[in-house]
């Protein structure tokens, strides 16, 4: 019986992962945003932020997701960035 639970949990987890991936694909499609475009945005963000701080580019995570608008709860695309900062640069302030 424990073996059955193990496999059913695995398929449930795989199902959830597949569901989340499908949601992400749909968000990208509805926002009319290709992976190449997202990479261009990521490169531009790195260039701008690097003027002000040293960042961990390997830990950088930029993705397109969806969120709800406050005034009408409509689902809209959102650009979410997690940018690990190594240190702030001295800009002569």
Swiss-Prot record:
<comment type="similarity">
    <text>Belongs to the MinE family.</text>
</comment>
<dbReference type="GO" id="GO:0051301">
    <property type="term" value="P:cell division"/>
</dbReference>
<keyword id="KW-0131">Cell cycle</keyword>
<dbReference type="InterPro" id="IPR005527">
    <property type="entry name" value="MinE"/>
</dbReference>
<keyword id="KW-0132">Cell division</keyword>
<dbReference type="InterPro" id="IPR036707">
    <property type="entry name" value="MinE_sf"/>
</dbReference>
<dbReference type="GO" id="GO:0032955">
    <property type="term" value="P:regulation of division septum assembly"/>
</dbReference>
<dbReference type="Pfam" id="PF03776">
    <property type="entry name" value="MinE"/>
</dbReference>
<comment type="function">
    <text>Prevents the cell division inhibition by proteins MinC and MinD at internal division sites while permitting inhibition at polar sites. This ensures cell division at the proper site by restricting the formation of a division septum at the midpoint of the long axis of the cell.</text>
</comment>
<protein>
    <recommendedName>
        <fullName>Cell division topological specificity factor</fullName>
    </recommendedName>
</protein>
């Amino acid at each position: 019986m424990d073996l059955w639970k193990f496999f059913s949990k695995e398929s449930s987890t795989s199902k959830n992962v597949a569901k989340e991936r499908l949601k992400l694909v749909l968000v990208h499609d509805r926002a009319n945003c290709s992976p190449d475009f997202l990479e261009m945005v990521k490169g531009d963000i790195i260039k701008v932020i690097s003027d002000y701080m040293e960042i961990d580019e390997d830990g950088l995570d930029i993705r397109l997701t969806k969120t709800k608008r406050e005034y009408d709860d409509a689902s809209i695309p959102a650009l979410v960035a997690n940018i690990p900062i190594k240190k702030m640069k001295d800009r002569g302030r």
